[in-house]
Design a protein with these regions (language model features):
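A broad structural signal for short, well-ordered beta-strand segments within beta-sheet-rich domains
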Residues: 1-6, 11-12, 255-257, 298-300, ...
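Short, non-transmembrane alpha-helical segments in secretory-pathway proteins
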Residues: 27-30, 34-45, 164-177, 226-264, ...
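Exposed beta-strand-loop-beta-strand "reactive/processing" segments of non-cytosolic proteins
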Residues: 86, 172-216, 251-297, 303-304, ...
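Zymogen propeptides/activation segments of proteases
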Residues: 87, 93-112, 130, 237, ...
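C-terminal, well-structured catalytic/ligand-binding subdomain of enzymes
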Residues: 287-326
């Protein structure tokens, strides 16, 4: 995630925090109180959101819109909400702390909270405030062409170089984890070179690159635990990750939730890879994993197994002004720091 902590005389910025990192703990404690006491939600605006970021505040950008109930669970509380938000900010306003939410599109909201400004100040004291800026604050002229909430940490972080191996999961491991008979003889190679394993109506298809897919054919062998008919965001994500983690090679990258959608009968989740909080994106724009739940049954799954290893040397970054100039050629483009996986090389 990206985070910014703003005080009276400076701002701390990070593009590599994770919700389980030690440095996130003060923010997590604050957000637990803010989300737990938020009430009286009302519509707000982009201008109000940006204005709040110039005051004493804590800002978190989760990179993609995620259910508020899932974000609350990451903070250690339960919150009932149908909203999905990409970013939020806890900011001081008229002697109180308000919660501002952005859905990643055109909708903004604001809530009052029971949190005192002194609690926010205590969080600010945990961070060394520098001169991190948002694109909408940039006075050079470069930032005006970018997405307004593009965050420019100063100084720029030093990220390790990553090496990548296109890893394959053994057929035996797949059969075991996905609940197939390990001694099945119902397997063949299709015309495209993929290995296909069939058991009843369930099918595993393994491509030559190691990417595989699974379909249940209506059978209910694989499922996630849920208290009701449809799993909550927490139940779905934790249950699916418990399965996928058994199929991801050991290394310096893990999966994180990219997208969540739920209808009356089904849940669709996509995941990407991240290393130390920095996203790894495939050049073709595809996700690392996609999972469909019918009720609480895993009805379809695909995974692109990759093994990433961090080196001791730093990965070079473009100078900020140069990166802003290049990104600004596309009006409204978001400038962010991440790794790009082109298949055999990683930048």
């Amino acid at each position: 995630m990206r985070a910014a902590v703003t005080g009276e005389y400076g701002r701390y910025g990070s593009i590599s925090l994770t919700t389980d990192s030690e440095s996130f703990t003060p923010i997590k404690t604050l957000l637990r109180e803010v989300l737990g006491s938020a009430r009286s939600r009302m519509d707000s605006s982009a201008a109000a959101f940006r204005s709040a970021l110039g005051k004493p505040s804590v800002y978190c950008d989760f990179l993609e819109p995620l259910p508020v109930s899932y974000l609350a669970d990451l903070m250690g509380i339960t919150a009932e909400s149908e909203l999905s938000v990409r970013a939020l900010a806890a900011a001081e306003q008229n002697g109180q702390v308000v919660l501002l939410l952005w859905d990643g599109g055109s909708r903004y909201y604001q809530c009052v909270t029971a949190v005192q400004p002194s609690t926010l100040t205590e969080v600010l004291d945990h961070f060394e405030l520098g001169v991190t800026a948002f694109a909408f604050e940039d006075l050079s002229g470069y930032g005006q062409h970018l997405a307004p909430l593009s965050l420019f940490p100063d100084p720029l972080p030093e990220l390790p170089q990553l090496t990548v191996t296109e890893s394959t999961v053994s057929t035996e491991t797949l059969l075991s984890v996905l609940g197939f008979n390990p001694h099945t003889n119902s397997r063949y190679t299709d015309a495209g070179g993929a290995e296909v394993v069939v058991e009843g109506d369930r099918v595993i298809r393994i491509s030559g690159s190691g990417t595989f897919s699974y379909t249940s054919g209506g059978e209910t062998v694989l499922s996630v635990e849920s208290a009701g008919g449809l799993p909550t965001p927490r139940e779905a994500v934790s249950g699916v990750l418990e399965l996928l983690d058994q199929l991801i090679p050991e290394g310096d990258a893990r999966l994180y939730l990219l997208e969540w959608q739920q209808s009356e009968t089904a849940t669709f989740l996509t995941f990407g890879y991240q290393s130390s909080g920095v996203p790894i994106r495939f050049a073709d724009g595809s996700a690392a994993a996609e999972v469909t739940l019918s009720g609480n049954t895993i009805s379809a799954l695909s995974l692109r197994p990759r093994q990433y290893s961090a080196a001791s040397s730093a990965s070079p970054l473009l100078p900020l002004r140069q990166a802003m100039s290049i990104a600004g050629r596309t009006e409204g483009a978001e400038l962010s720091i991440g790794y790009a996986d082109t298949g055999c090389l990683l930048y």
